[in-house]
Regions:
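An alpha-helical support segment within catalytic cores of ATP-dependent transferases
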Residues: 80-92, 167-170, 206-290, 301-304
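ATP-binding pocket architecture of kinase catalytic cores
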Residues: 104-231
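ATP/Mg2+ or Mg2+-diphosphate-binding catalytic cores
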Residues: 71, 369-395
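A glycine-centered beta->alpha junction motif in the catalytic cores
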Residues: 168, 172-189, 203, 242-246, ...
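Conserved N-terminal boundary motif of the eukaryotic protein kinase catalytic domain
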Residues: 96-101
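Active-site Asp-x-Gly
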Residues: 229-242, 246-247, 283-288, 295-355, ...
């Protein structure tokens, strides 16, 4: 998830009330930066929301949500610290001097910061860094680096330049992702600028072997996606959805409706909506997708006024898959963005199945997010509602 701008000095005392039997993590956001993002998180997680210091801070309580970060003593960002791990320093410009580090942004899964350096010629340069712990964190950082590298190589003006990923030398089992720092404003991008770039990403990308998938596992949040190569989009998507359902079941346990709905989804709904894309002379081009392109994973560059995307978990997919993430209630990429996108890239045939396909793709996203937020029954009910609707229409 996107690491939003945050104020490094948080209120020491906050007037909040929390049920005593709920284990919580407290995440602070500067309210005026992105009120929509705050409320989006509340909608998708079912968390409690309250305001402290009107129009300045919002506190989100996320039940039992564990960050994948165990701390990095002596190397935390901010507080006057200018020390960075040798592995990170080796990836910064040769001969530079670190003049400041700051905690920058908020992430559910990682620690995020900004590193300011002075180059040999006296100019200043800034970098964004994300740090995460444990073996799983290594795979998460590798997947994000490869995703952002693939996007940046294809469209360098559409994503911050990824520089490196690696493992700290001074702290065991601590991993990082490093990229150029881009100062961004948290506003919706111009539909035409954004849609034209996204369409170009989809249209100009080329799967290295002509198949659907990716060359390594990528992570949406802190959970893996199924990226093994497949010739058929229908087969690939079914495996992706099955993986997400397995993760959701592991997180929240069984539900009687699963035994009724899931077989129909796989035996009837998926073939009904996806098989026509690859029959009667039709085919699906494997396009590079961001993989988690909701509003909070985009921004507008302060200097260029151009739209940017980040926090990618890429793979090669049907381009319309991207818009499954634009269907849930937390979405802010509305009909105008879809219509503008399709002025650059036409809807796949059969056109009459378009809405159904997007709702099927939405199920994949909603299943994954339900697996991420274990305590949220709202998200499971949302997922089951998606299944009921699809079964009623296409089962």
């Amino acid at each position: 998830m996107h690491a939003l701008h945050s104020n490094p000095t948080m209120p020491a005392l906050l007037d909040v009330a929390v049920a005593a039997d709920i284990q919580v993590s407290v995440v602070y956001y500067k309210y005026r930066t992105s009120p929509f993002y705050i409320h989006s998180i509340c909608l998708i997680t079912g968390v409690k929301l309250c305001n402290s210091t009107p129009l300045l801070y919002t506190i989100i309580y996320i039940a039992s949500l564990k960050m994948n970060y165990n701390g990095a003593e002596g190397l935390e960002f901010g507080g006057g610290n200018t020390k960075v791990d040798p592995s990170v320093l080796s990836e910064l410009p040769k001969g530079c001097r670190v003049v400041a580090t700051e905690s920058h942004g908020v992430s559910f899964w990682a620690n995020t910061g900004r590193i300011d350096v002075e180059l040999l010629d006296g100019t200043l340069q800034k970098f964004f860094i994300k740090v995460i712990s444990e073996e799983q964190g290594k795979y998460m950082m590798h997947g994000e680096f490869e995703s952002m590298k693939t996007i940046h190589t294809l469209m360098p003006d559409f994503a911050p330049r990824p520089i490196a990923w690696g493992t700290y030398k001074s702290i065991p089992n601590t991993h990082f992702f490093l990229c150029d720092y881009r100062d961004m404003i948290d506003e919706m991008p111009d539909p035409h600028k954004f849609a034209s770039r996204l369409a170009a990403l989809h249209q100009n990308s080329k799967s290295p072997n002509g198949k659907f998938g990716f060359h390594l596992t990528t992570y949406s949040g802190n959970l893996p996606q199924m990226n093994e190569w497949e010739d058929s989009w229908e087969v690939y998507f079914a495996k992706c959805l099955r993986n997400a359902l397995d993760l959701e079941l592991e997180a929240k346990g069984d539900d009687p409706e699963f035994h009724v709905l899931v077989p129909i989804i796989f035996e009837k709904v998926i073939p009904r909506l996806l098989r026509p894309l690859e029959t009667e002379g039709r085919s699906v081009k494997p396009s590079l997708v961001h993989g988690d392109l909701w509003y909070a994973n985009s921004g507008i560059d302060v200097d260029s006024d151009e739209s940017l995307i980040f926090d990618a978990c890429c793979f090669y997919a049907h381009n319309e898959y991207e818009f499954g993430q634009w269907r849930p209630v937390c979405n802010k990429f509305g009909a105008e963005y879809l219509a503008t996108y399709h002025s650059y890239a036409q809807i796949s045939a059969p056109v009459e199945d378009y809405d159904g396909r997007l709702d099927l793709y939405k199920l994949r996203f909603n299943t994954h997010v339900s697996a991420l937020f274990i305590e949220s029954e709202t998200l499971r009910e949302q997922m089951l509602g998606d299944m009921r609707d699809l079964v009623k229409r296409y089962g």
